[in-house]
């Protein structure tokens, strides 16, 4: 059984990890332990690079805390221009997989608050009057009327980030690189 470390305590992100690992590896093949680690980027990362760095640093911190695990998963949500998205970083042994989620265009009234230094989740909670919306469907769930959610969008990106770990061609290429 695989031991998976979720470098987050956010239920929406943990559920996305669970669903993606079930899709790829099957039920009852892993257990997930969530841990709170610092991304070492601002609470609301701005830009592609800062967001990706946050996901990578979450994985690095999680590996230090739980070096005995089989997988370490970092999910970092960010904003670039007028879009929200997330970077997923997964490490297994010496292999790293990364993927960026789909993006959602945000309305100007939300972006204004973010530019003033507030988190997207806080702005969404204020606008929608939904407490802790970021740990539920998030902006994605709200604006798509539940057709998508943070969990569903992140789940797809997690499956894609697992490809270098699970696909034979990647494994063969990694072996050649090591020789």
UniProtKB/Swiss-Prot annotation:
Cofactor, how bound (note): Binds 1 divalent metal cation per subunit; can use either Mg(2+) or Mn(2+).
SUPFAM superfamilies: ITPase-like
Ligand binding (substrate): 8-13, 68-69
Stored Gene3D superfamilies: 3.90.950.10
UniProt cofactor(s): Mg(2+); Mn(2+)
UniProt xrefs under Pfam families: NTPase_I-T (PF01931)
GO molecular function: ITPase activity; metal ion binding; nucleotide binding; ribonucleoside triphosphate phosphatase activity
Oligomeric and partner information: Homodimer.
Protein's name according to its UniProt entry: Inosine/xanthosine triphosphatase
Organism from which the protein derives: Proteus mirabilis (strain HI4320)
